[in-house]
Amino acid sequence: MSHSGAAIFEKVSGIIAINEDVSPAELTWRSTDGDKVHTVVLSTIDKLQATPASSEKMMLRLIGKVDESKKRKDNEGNEVVPKPQRHMFSFNNRTVMDNIKMTLQQIISRYKDADIYEEKRRREESAQHTETPMSSSSVTAGTPTPHLDTPQLNNGAPLINTAKLDDSLSKEKLLTNLKLQQSLLKGNKVLMKVFQETVINAGLPPSEFWSTRIPLLRAFALSTSQKVGPYNVLSTIKPVASSENKVNVNLSREKILNIFENYPIVKKAYTDNVPKNFKEPEFWARFFSSKLFRKLRGEKIMQNDRGDVIIDRYLTLDQEFDRKDDDMLLHPVKKIIDLDGNIQDDPVVRGNRPDFTMQPGVDINGNSDGTVDILKGMNRLSEKMIMALKNEYSRTNLQNKSNITNDEEDEDNDERNELKIDDLNESYKTNYAIIHLKRNAHEKTTDNDAKSSADSIKNADLKVSNQQMLQQLSLVMDNLINKLDLNQVVPNNEVSNKINKRVITAIKINAKQAKHNNVNSALGSFVDNTSQANELEVKSTLPIDLLESCRMLHTTCCEFLKHFYIHFQSGEQKQASTVKKLYNHLKDCIEKLNELFQDVLNGDGESMSNTCTAYLKPVLNSITLATHKYDEYFNEYNNNSN
């Protein structure tokens, strides 16, 4: 669209032109002979009127704003508002007038919205309201947005540093990450109750509590640190036209930051013009109506499309940015897989230049319609977004194999072998050597002898009596409970590590199969994907409050028992004080269990007490066994020292 054209002002012919290079923009009319010049500052215009399309006359009227400070009083003492200044232009061409009118509408609308925003800010400052950052704003052909000098997202700080993921997920960092632990406790009510009973009420150190839940912390940290990666932000922004030739755009602060990150040319245009040439809302209004916006979005730019004079200057600069990106993304490709390079180097296959009808995006005159440039721009943006993720989630450590141990390298090779596509490889065929056996005459048997031996085996008494079965079971249980010592099963650490590795490999394979086949790993059966929260509990004769007390006491006892065996079986002398504290906690657990049994017996009767005792008897026996082991080793140590 044109920004200039022939117009008549005060019955004098001339040329009217809109100058957007200055701030604020100006409309200048100059007579044909150059003697008369009339300039209108568009920021002072309040209304724009035009004759309808059905009228033979073609005129534009610009009505200026009324200055409230210049009110005056008449002879009767009443305040009289001064008349606004009017500018009338006549045209001889309907197309020229429509183009000028549309340009003036957009410019005047931007200034009016900026005035509304300034008035709103003045009211807020007068009312002494602190300005809070907005989660999203509406850019309406110049609607202001919060200033972006110090951007702050409302999502909050991440719980871990994803750029250094290996370091953030280490045991030391997880044990000292209090925010991560607090977030996990807030989201898991059951774990929160266990934490209150064991750490807050019973005095278990928090480091001990979390030391057995490192995998849980690590999984929670990974699940909460997931974030949206880079994407084509401009493709999600859709300007919507409204009344008064305004364009409404919903633009959040996060999208603005993503635009600056993915499109450096937009950030450069922003820093060059805000607040030097115009305010931030006017910048976004100009940007969304510019050709640069349509180009970055992946749309074709037609010759008749109207853009923005200032923002569209960065189109040529954007080409320089594209060339720099191409050089940065350029990487060598071997000729054995560079098919495009092979075709270009083959003169026989390539032949003469294809006809213009076979060239993509080129007309008969050899002019490009921009399709290839759009595709190249989208590919360039995709590569940049992928390159932006190379430092996220410790991807840079994948190529650094200097610190990888043999076991980790073997696991890495196993995973790579699983990912290989071996469908086209030749399958290995086993070749067997045929061996012919010759029997002697005295070793040959007849068919009748074979039948008789089979009948004798079939008729044999293979039944096992109940007494024999009970004897065998008691023998196995006696060996497992009294004679088997798990500490002496694998005395060599090397053998233990190999066995652990085989077990972990088997678990991985079974887990993949179970996930694929929807198999419950605990029951070994096919299950539905229904949530466990919807499952009904097993019926119990105990009241709900008593049952919940038994559960919490059982969980607390198991927690202390687990930590006791971890330190007790370590064999380290420096753990003696910790084992002593845990031993005292186990003694307290025994007292709490006995108190609960006695309270239930006195308050609810013998039958209820028997049920409660049956529930908690296994954990009581386990704690008693642990305390007996500690007393035994403690007495043995004292006797040896004496």
From Swiss-Prot:
Keywords: DNA damage, DNA repair, Nucleus, Phosphoprotein, Repeat, Transcription, Transcription regulation. Residues 65-76 have a biased composition (Basic and acidic residues). Pfam families: BSD, PH_TFIIH. It comes from the Eukaryota. The keyword Magnesium does not apply. SMART domains: BSD. Residues 129-143 have a biased composition (Polar residues). One of its GO terms (biological process) is DNA repair. One of its GO terms (molecular function) is phosphatidylinositol-3-phosphate binding. Residues 165-221, 243-295 form the BSD domain. Residues 65-85, 120-154, 399-418 are annotated as: Disordered. Its main location: nucleus. Gene3D superfamilies: BSD domain, Pleckstrin-homology domain (PH domain)/Phosphotyrosine-binding domain (PTB). The modification Phosphothreonine is found at residue 150. Component of the 7-subunit TFIIH core complex composed of XPB/SSL2, XPD/RAD3, SSL1, TFB1, TFB2, TFB4 and TFB5, which is active in NER. The core complex associates with the 3-subunit CTD-kinase module TFIIK composed of CCL1, KIN28 and TFB3 to form the 10-subunit holoenzyme (holo-TFIIH) active in transcription. An additionnal subunit, TFB6, plays a role in the dissociation of the SSL2 helicase from TFIIH after transcription initiation. TFB1 interacts with XPC/RAD4. XPC/RAD4 recruits TFIIH to the NER machinery. Interacts with the NER 3'-endonuclease XPG/RAD2. This is General transcription and DNA repair factor IIH subunit TFB1. The gene is TFB1.
